[in-house]
Amino acid sequence: VLMDLFGNPPFIDESTPTGKVYPRQISRKELFSYVESELKAIESDLKAPKANVYGRADQATAWALLSRLYLNAEVYTGTERYADAATYAERVIASGKYSLHTNYDRLFLADNNLNNPEVLLSVNYDGQRSQNWGGMTFLINSSTGGDAKKATGVNMGVNGGWNGNRATAGLLNLFGGNLATDKRALIKAVGSGEIKSVTEFNEGVYVYKFRNVTSAGANGSNGDHADTDFPLFRLAELYLNFAEAAVRGKADVAKGLTYLNLVRARAYGSAVGNYASLPALTEILAERGREFYWEGQRRTDLIRFGKFTSGDYVWPWKAGVKEGKASDAYRQLYPIPADDIQANPENLRQNPKY
């Protein structure tokens, strides 16, 4: 996360002395190599895929993280590693321990810890035993409120809701004319989905993907704190990682098409949405948007595809304007927090242009 968001963070490891220490700053490329080497070094120490208890990492988790790491290697290091991304995605797939959940929406419900063959690793929440105001409690409560409940008619399983987060029409446009047929479209637009004012919660696109409701329709155990677990890695990601590598000419084309169509078939409930051949990269980006919205992957994907700050791909309120516009490329990284720099001025340097 530090490598992805900040690029060049302060760094400590087991060799760092105890006591008052001013951590050195590590480059993004150096941190990439460190993470890669650590994941490979611990592989034999981890339990086999699906052999660990729910919510704990195993070998498949390490392979999935390596696949994600290699998929973004060109951004992080300047050298592409798409073939390696496909190799480690295939390790997870070939383990045979995971399969796509039949019902997409049940991946994101209060009992998603049960009978879930797709999730490799999750951040676990329990409304009785792990109460906090962040995590899934925030994500679910901030997505709903009085207006949202009226507009969607969907029970979110929470007491009231906080009113706040909603998507722009950009998410709506990803689904195009398939809102009624793509089962991943757990969204509801207010009118056209346009947001005229960012302070108005009754505008835009409501997202009810994550809910504190069980697959049987019962509310979670606590209306103030969510039971829903957050999926960090899903098999669908490994399928789409491989497919992207195939489109980029770095993995088997036939296998990439098969994996892509498995994701599509789950979304549509049949082969009606399947591709006859691998689509263009722009469609892979769109497919990832449809599959992983609200799961924290879109920014990273847009940067990898060169679309996060560019002017050839805009969405409402990009760069802070209603119509959307290009942004400065340096904003692909967040600034190093000022408190960190002030506490460690000799070692830390701010990211360029901040």
Residue ranges: model-predicted function:
Residues V1-A57, Y70-V75, K209-P231, F242-P279, ...:
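Aromatic-anchored glycine-rich loop motif in surface-exposed flexible loops
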Residues I12-S15, L46-L65, L69-G145, S270-E283, ...:
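Short, surface-exposed recognition loops and adjoining beta-strand edges that mediate ligand/DNA contacts
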Residues R91-Y239, E244-R248, F308-Y354:
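Elongated scaffold/linker segments in the mid-to-C-terminal portions of large proteins
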